[in-house]
């Protein structure tokens, strides 16, 4: 089966540290590997409203449909994000909130279609490596993968604030070069 990677860029900063790290890692994928890069700020979702116990959900429409279809079409979902206040940026959190609706869409069947797929995480925080500010994000995404019967295939964490700082760390740059060859996190 051909692999199809969906890179979801959660930063509002173009060419920021997390994107640079992800692009370096993606450059090492085998030639011909399908990659799709979507910026969540260019695909804004409406506010999420929990309708589980009232009217229920219809099929996603507009931008939500585009993101949902790209998500289920991928074999590998790559979340590319800075760490904001020990969490994902709002656009990424909103994307995952919408999964609650997409799981209940009879046409989409998100949970069934995501089972067995791989979730990859590329994060950059502004702390030092030993401070662990990315840990809450990684825990949340690990739990998401478990709930969806996905495999958390790898987590690449860099540290930096100004664009380019994360790749100045030789160990992080080297990890990016082999990231998609790693086993489950």
Where do the model's predicted regions map?
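Short, basic/glycine-rich phosphate-binding loops at helix/coil junctions
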Residues: 44-49, 120-121, 156-157
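Short, solvent-exposed coil/turn elements at secondary-structure transition points
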Residues: 41-43, 125, 158-161
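Glycine-rich phosphate/pyrophosphate-binding loop and the adjoining helix
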Residues: 135, 139-185
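Short histidine/acidic/glycine/proline-rich micro-motifs that form metal-
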Residues: 12-15, 83-86, 126-130, 161-164
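Residue-level signal for alpha-helical context at structural boundaries
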Residues: 23, 36, 110-113, 137, ...
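N-terminal beta1-alpha1-beta2 submodule of the flavodoxin-like/Rossmannoid cofactor-binding fold
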Residues: 1-104, 170-185
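Short, glycine-/small-residue-rich phosphate/pyrophosphate-handling segment
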Residues: 108-153
């Amino acid at each position: 089966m051909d692999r199809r990677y969906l890179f979801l860029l959660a930063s509002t900063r173009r060419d920021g540290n997390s994107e640079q790290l992800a692009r370096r890692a993606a450059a090492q994928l085998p030639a011909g590997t399908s990659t799709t890069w979507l910026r969540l700020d260019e695909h804004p979702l409406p506010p999420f409203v929990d309708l589980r116990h009232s009217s229920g959900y219809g099929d996603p429409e507009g931008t939500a449909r585009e993101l949902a279809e790209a998500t289920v079409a991928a074999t590998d979902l790559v979340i590319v994000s800075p760490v904001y206040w020990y969490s994902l940026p709002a656009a990424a959190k909103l994307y995952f909130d919408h999964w609650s609706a997409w799981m209940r869409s009879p046409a989409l069947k998100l949970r069934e279609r995501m089972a067995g797929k791989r979730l990859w995480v590329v994060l950059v925080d502004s702390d030092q490596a030993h401070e662990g500010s990315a840990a809450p994000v990684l825990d949340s995404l690990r739990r998401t993968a478990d709930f969806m019967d996905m495999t958390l295939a790898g987590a690449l964490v860099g540290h930096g604030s100004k664009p380019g700082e994360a790749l100045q760390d030789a160990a992080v740059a080297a990890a990016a070069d082999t990231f998609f060859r790693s086993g489950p996190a």
